Amino acid sequence: MTTLTPFIPLNFPITAIVGQEAIKLALLLGAIDPGLGGIVIAGRRGTAKSVMARAIHTLLPPIEIIKGNRYQCDPKNPGSWDDDTLEKFADVPLDQLETQVIPAPFIQIPLGVTEDRLLGSVDVEKSVKQGEAVFQPGLLAQAHRGVLYIDELNLLDDQIANQLLTVLTEGKNQIEREGMSFQHPCQPLLIATYNPEEGPLRRHLLDRIAIALSADGILGLDQRVAAVDQVLAYADSPISFIDQYDAELDDLKTTIILAREWLKEVSLTPEQVSYLVEEAIRGGLQGHRGELFAMRVAKAIAALDGRSDVQADDLRQAVELVIVPRSVLMDNPPPPEQAPPPPPPPQNQDEGKDEQEDQQDDKEDDKDNEPEAEQDPPSIPEEFIFDPEGVSLDPSVLYFAQMAQKQGKSGSRSVIFSDDRGRYLKPILPKGKVRRIAVDATLRAASPYQKSRRLRHPDRQVIVEQGDIRGKKLVRKAGALIVFLVDASGSMALNRMQAAKGAVMQLLTEAYENRDQVSLIPFQGENAEVLLPPTRSIAMAKKRLETLPCGGGSPLSHGLMQAVNVGMNAKRSGDIGQVVIVAITDGRGNIPLARSLGDEIPEGEKPDIKAELLEIAAKIRGLGMQLLVINTEKKFVSTGFGKELAQKAGGKYYQLPKATDQGIASMARQAIADMQ
């Protein structure tokens, strides 16, 4: 027996959205094949990103589930059932299962979601009553066979995003926690949106999602006017507005249902697979996800058109939707290969020319007399998209590819995990003293044992023991500290100091957004002095760097130790996650550390300054700091020790006799990006 649950959608019709044809096609393909791999829509505010995501949900057909099942299990597919359902209906024939039809779910993941809320946890109330751990489904369980929507994907916690995509890739959620082992299906259509102005999306996440497009394409005047008219009409009377598109929406719903059936019959030939792989190679894609996603997209396109065979246009569209946005070559296509020169004409060419023309005329006459044969559409495109003379692409595809290239290796700064301050990420088993108790997780851990504990202590309502206590794992964003260590001795000292000062001012202009801090330590004479403590203040930097000390000896050992101490103190503050030491020096220190610290050096003993420097470099590496050595001396006078110093610290060495503030700042940025 089947029960039908009524549902009246009020989402903006997808057919009423002006423009965005590539995105609408991608969403339709996702509706046909929810296991496609997900769709990401990038765009600024007001570009209908979330409107399109919700609009496609209206087109999804209702789903039949086992009546009362919390995981939307398909009664015809026992292979995808959760553990409880498999155990409960192990001996029940499929045709005797009681079912119901419900709307496909639409679940939105909030930005502050915890791991327990996403993946599921212990149901405290039921566990207390039953005396055993009972699983409470999370958001991923509720989204099975529906739409899982993430707004502002770029702002979602990295660990949460990785766990979410792992579950979607595997198609199931395996829970192993608090004395409980359980698995349930999770196969929704993933749709995510984000605004690039609020921060870039990590390339790692982008690589795990099938289709990524931009909604920032420029609309013409007529299209903008039409879009405004549509929005006003919908706001005035949503039901009347939707009624105008009922016929179109019904046609699309039918198309999706039929296409899902066609999809079961669609297959690719080996030649077509080779074409997609070749396009991925030409586009410079890393890994195999690109071509695998493109194969599923091509099959979904054929199914959408009501065909079981994949044609050349299907492959071309799949490349545009999947491979092009991933390409690293769109901004710099390879130069065209020069065609070989034509062979020289034979000496008797003129003599045989008339005879060849007569033969050609005879062939054309024969062709005219033959019946016209029907030509099948080609199964493989005649040219590659990643050719120098490539085909024209949809602006939304190209825009996203170029945007991803501009993004480069930039991304969110590091995060710091702690147990004292930050955003609550997940509960953890405490090691030692618990600074902040996770009350929710503690109660869940204690709930299965309440029944037995009350027998021992009938006068107490809730009994929590030491083994139930869970702590909070907290996370907060952290910036980077760039410590400029500048050799202020010698004739070129002033040039080095001016370049470092310019780099400091450049990086400080970007410091607020990234939470970065900058410090400057010149070393000259007998010791090194922290001229600019870690700061994000441009005003403070200008004031402190008005006078630049120069001349004297080169106490490089003391300078490196000062930089290490500044970095360690900054990390202890909890606001800094990465430390980069940029040493602008040739590596020729001539003042031992003991002398800089005021310690007595035994008479007749000569300190090994080189060994001292290498020991400090090893310490820098052990502390997880990055060392960049920039040698501004000319190559023919360089000792080469600066390179050895950088290698010992696991850092990088640059020979730049004419180092500029822009170049130094760029190297520091790259070092931070490499540490992420």
Swiss-Prot record:
Domain VWFA span(s) in chain numbering: 481-672
Compositional bias annotation for Pro residues: 332-347
Pathway the protein contributes to: Porphyrin-containing compound metabolism; chlorophyll biosynthesis
Annotated region described as Disordered, given as residue ranges: 328-387
Keyword Ligase: yes
Pfam families xref list: AAA_lid_2, Mg_chelatase, VWA_2
Domain of life assignment: Bacteria
GO terms for MF: ATP binding; ATP hydrolysis activity; magnesium chelatase activity
Keyword Chloroplast in record: no
E.C. number(s) listed in UniProt: 6.6.1.1
Biased composition (Acidic residues): 352-375
Record field: catalytic activity: protoporphyrin IX + Mg(2+) + ATP + H2O = Mg-protoporphyrin IX + ADP + phosphate + 3 H(+)
Job description of the protein: Involved in chlorophyll biosynthesis; introduces a magnesium ion into protoporphyrin IX to yield Mg-protoporphyrin IX.
Similarity comment text for this entry: Belongs to the Mg-chelatase subunits D/I family.
UniProt name for this protein: Magnesium-chelatase subunit ChlD
Species this chain originates from: Synechocystis sp. (strain ATCC 27184 / PCC 6803 / Kazusa)
Gene: chlD
